[in-house]
């Protein structure tokens, strides 16, 4: 089964899951290629929901094109479910996210939501997190200090650049992204707390304190659902 077909299958499974919600509620939607499948497949059922909150400008544009009513996070007090992908996920449901650069907004919406449904294909499942570079959103003026601190933690920080321009990648919030290579993250909850304490770090792409409640993973045999308790 090709990767796109796996993404479509898990996105369809997530649609089936969220349509179990009573009508008239809000839904959180993430960012990335699998989330895009989810948006497109859910579009015919948008009337079931009062509105959606989105983790990025890119997802918001796609949602509006598909006719969804997109709400600002400040307008929403009750968010039953957030659906998003992951760059890596371990057997405990801890994730690395933020490969697309939207980690801060993803983290805010994940914290607001009662349930986090992670959708991905089996290639994202790992025993230990860290092979995928861990993204940090940072305040630009803190970059040299954060870089030194990350080196002391045993990681190699690389500032994310845009194409051939040699300019730093700018997030939707005006921050920079530091991708940390070379970490073997055996203690994700502790590392998340440790990195969050570094002055100038806006957020870290470790979703361990708030992990996935339900993983829908696409593999050769179809979609497998794995529940995790917080």
Go through each PLM region and give its residues.
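Conserved phosphate- and dinucleotide-binding cores of soluble alpha/beta proteins
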Residues: 2-9, 57-230
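Active-site catalytic microenvironments in core metabolic enzymes, especially phosphate/sugar-handling
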Residues: 1-26, 31-78, 210
């Amino acid at each position: 089964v090709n990767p796109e077909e796996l993404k479509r299958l898990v996105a369809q499974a997530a649609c089936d899951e969220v349509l179990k919600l009573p009508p008239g509620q809000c839904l959180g939607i993430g960012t990335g290629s699998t989330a895009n499948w989810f948006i497109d497949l859910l579009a015919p059922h948008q009337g079931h929901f009062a509105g959606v909150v989105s983790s990025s400008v890119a997802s918001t544009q796609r949602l509006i094109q598909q006719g969804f009513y997109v709400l600002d996070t400040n307008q929403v007090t009750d968010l039953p479910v957030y659906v998003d992908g992951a760059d890596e996920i371990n057997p405990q449901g801890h994730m690395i996210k933020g490969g697309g650069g939207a980690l801060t907004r993803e983290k805010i919406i994940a914290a607001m939501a009662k349930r986090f449904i992670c959708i991905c294909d089996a290639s994202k499942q790992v025993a230990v997190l860290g092979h995928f570079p861990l993204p940090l959103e940072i305040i630009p003026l803190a970059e040299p200090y954060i870089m030194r601190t990350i080196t002391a933690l045993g990681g190699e920080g690389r500032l994310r650049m845009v194409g051939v321009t040699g300019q730093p990648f700018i997030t939707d919030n005006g921050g920079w992204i530091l991708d940390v290579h070379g970490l073997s993250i055996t203690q994700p909850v502790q590392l998340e707390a440790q990195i969050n304490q570094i002055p100038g770090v806006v957020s870290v792409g470790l979703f361990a304190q708030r992990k996935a409640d339900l993983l829908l993973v696409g593999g050769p045999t179809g979609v497998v659902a794995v529940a995790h308790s917080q």
